[in-house]
Amino acid sequence: KIDVLAARYLTNTKITCKYLTVELKKDEAEKSTINQILKYVDWVCTEYAYGDYEMIEACIIAAGYEEGMDRYYREVVQRHYTQGSHPVRNKQWNDLKLLKYTCVDGEIVYEDVTPPLR
């Protein structure tokens, strides 16, 4: 099950403009965690975002990440899709952030460790 699924609405409306999917791991995230959240992203895209990946942001928050996660992230994170009909626009989604958390002096500190796609 999705740990966190949030929706952002256009100001003063009930129209959804973005969805945020978050997977939380108290320890180290494994490569399978990326697969897990990408399944959630695909499901949200189909069920809520009308096939528009641009409406979705995703994030994994973990205490650390398994060795080799950078390379695996680059291999699997991108989603290719088509938008519109006249003209058709080919798009690419890769809006998955990897955040590492630590506790410093009783405060939770987040560091963005998302690998660049190059």
Protein language model features and the residues they cover:
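Charged, terminal alpha-helix-loop-beta segments
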Residues: K1-R118
